[in-house]
Design a protein with these regions (language model features):
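Cleft-lining beta-strand/loop regions that shape enzyme active-site pockets
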Residues: 34-39, 53, 187-193, 215-218, ...
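Terminal targeting/pro-maturation regions of precursor/exported proteins
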Residues: 16-212
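PDZ/PDZ-like domain segments forming the peptide/carboxylate-binding groove
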Residues: 89, 93, 109-110, 130, ...
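Conserved functional hotspot residues or short segments at active or partner-binding sites
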Residues: 470, 479-536
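Structured segments of extracytoplasmic/periplasmic soluble domains
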Residues: 51-55, 102, 106-114, 123, ...
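Signal peptide processing junction and immediate N-terminal pro/mature segment
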Residues: 9-17
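Bacterial N-terminal signal peptides
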Residues: 1-8
Length: 536
């Protein structure tokens, strides 16, 4: 399965909204970031480091701090994963040495660039070094951490003096080095082999780009469900806001959450009698997880400060790509479609929405891709065919020949009406494929803000063995029909709209057409279409 996923599966918290100009120097920015690290607010630290690097791109301390925060965040996320805990408890040395070898071989075979075994091993050593200072790792693996602190410090120093960037000539030598590290940690710390080797297995992937990662069984199942457009749970997207609780960014249509009265912009304050106003996103998510048919009781506050509570039963939730379709200007026949993902059934949903609007007199379309993180490559090409008459819509190029593909459309399903595309900084991957095709084919006007800038392809590589594990690897870059790649910069819109007041697009499914029209991005899109229609 080939994916375009804009974000790297970090459930980050809500960072303080600081503009780059808020820092007068890199050391000042570093201090603010390290304060968040000290408070173990890894997600917020990651966001703040990224923002600081926009101003001080070459600062090595900020770059290292970002890597450190990402490693700690990954360690704590793994240890909050039940499937990872199962691996920790029942995996032996030989099994995990084989897993390390399998992961590396898959990386060498599929990844966009060649990665040396020495580099892969070195990043595993760094992950173990960081983990030995992580409170969650220490609490899980050491019953009496205070009594062992001096030994922990000694082992960390040995990792630097003996194993840091240690060159290896092949798999056999690598297994010897890993065995030696296991022996050291068992002798000095009574740390079991699985805790050591799993840091190497998962941490080795830190040598890759930020979109490449080894997925635990639970995360692989979650990803598979997202691709298929289904999940088990309540059907919410949330971010922690310190002191306020879990801010609901989205509530899925037809989900237990929506049916029980939860709405975007509500704040969950209590989960099964646990106050979550100061929990991290990940910690709150652990409390919300459960099997289909199980119940959870929530308390929440709505935007009008009204308090609510209720019991919700977890079940399978279908994730829809098209979350709103409506006519915005019936006189001129201007319709609106909101698309939030590119999944297996997205094209069928889009076709149904288009047929419905066409029955109402559709003459021009506003396609809203704001906040759309992407999805499946084949789906993106099929969506593009609904609007591009013929020719290339996207091409991919990778290290392996099978990653070099050109996606063409024939115009069989093309709609000829004028198009306005709305994008923003969270429109990524597959959304950027559509934007690139619309731009290069001169098919419509693009409105909003620069796109995310993730122009790479990720492939899911299933790992051997009984456990349902997989690698998500960057295997290629993609290019617009005119052979442009906007990685790191994003595609600029034709009509730039300042992002002064962010309108939450998930609200649009319950707003009237007049309320949608009042959104600045939509208003600009309608204006462009009206001008186009008046010329016809």
């Amino acid at each position: 399965v080939t994916l375009f996923l804009a974000l790297n599966w970090l459930a980050v918290g809500h960072a303080e909204e600081l503009k780059p100009a808020a820092w007068s120097s890199a050391p000042e920015a570093l201090q603010k970031c390290e304060e968040l690290e000290t408070a173990r607010k890894w997600g917020e630290a990651i966001q703040l480091y990224e923002k600081a690097l926009e101003s001080f791109a070459g600062d090595q301390s900020l770059k290292y701090g970002l890597r450190r925060a990402r490693i700690h965040h990954a360690v704590e996320r793994r240890y909050g994963d039940l499937s990872f805990q199962g691996m920790l408890n029942d995996s032996g040395r030989t099994q995990l040495l084989n897993m390390f070898e399998d992961v590396y071989r898959s990386v060498q075979r599929e990844y966009l660039e060649s990665v040396s075994l020495t580099r892969f091993l070195a990043h595993g050593t760094e992950s173990l070094y960081m983990a030995l200072k992580n409170p969650v790792f220490i609490e899980k693996n050491f019953p009496d951490p205070a009594a062992r602190q001096s030994r922990i410090n000694s082992v960390r120093q040995t990792l630097i003096s003996t194993y840091w960037n240690r060159p290896v000539s092949g798999v056999a030598e690598t297994r010897q080095v890993l065995g030696s590290v296991c022996d050291l940690c068992r002798r000095e710390l009574n740390l079991k082999d699985s805790a050591v080797l799993l840091e190497y297995v998962f941490g080795g992937c830190n040598a890759l780009d930020e979109y490449s990662v080894l997925l635990t069984p639970d995360r692989y199942r979650e990803l598979h469900g997202t691709i298929q457009g289904e999940m088990v749970g309540l059907g919410i997207e949330m971010k922690a806001e310190a002191g306020r609780g879990m801010h609901l960014l989205n509530v899925l249509l037809g989900s237990p959450a929506e049916e029980g009265g939860l709405r975007p912009d509500d704040y969950i304050t209590d989960i099964n009698s646990t106050d979550c106003r100061n929990l991290s996103t990940d910690d709150a998510a652990k409390l919300l997880r459960g099997s289909a048919g199980s119940a959870v009781r929530l308390s929440w506050i709505s935007p009008d400060n009204q308090k609510h509570s209720g019991e919700f039963t977890r079940r399978r939730v279908d994730i829809h790509s098209i979350t709103r379709r409506t006519m915005l200007d019936r006189q001129r026949g201007i319709g609106y479609i909101r698309m939030e993902g590119f999944q297996e059934d997205t094209v069928q949903e889009l076709d149904a929405a288009l047929r419905s609007l066409e029955a109402e007199g559709l003459q021009a379309l506003v396609l809203d891709l704001r906040g759309n993180p992407g999805g499946l490559l084949d789906t993106a090409a099929a969506v593009a065919e609904r609007f591009i008459g013929s020719g290339v819509v996207v091409s991919t190029r990778g290290r392996n020949q099978n990653q070099n593909q050109v996606y063409r459309v024939t115009g069989t399903y093309t709609r000829p009406y004028p198009l306005a595309l709305i994008v923003d900084g969270d429109s990524a991957s597959a959304s950027e494929i559509i934007a690139g095709a619309v731009r290069d084919h001169n098919r419509g006007v693009i409105v909003g803000r620069p796109t995310y800038g993730k122009w790479s392809v990720q492939t899911i590589v299933r790992m051997p063995g009984e456990r349902e594990m997989a690698l998500r690897l960057t295997t290629a870059k993609f290019y617009s029909p005119d052979d442009r790649n906007y990685s790191g910069v994003g595609l600029q819109p034709d009509v730039l709209v300042p992002d002064a007041t962010q309108t939450r697009t998930t609200f649009f499914r319950t707003r009237t057409p007049d309320e949608i029209n009042a959104d600045p991005d939509v208003a600009e899109a309608i204006s462009a279409l009206q001008q186009r229609l008046s010329r016809n």
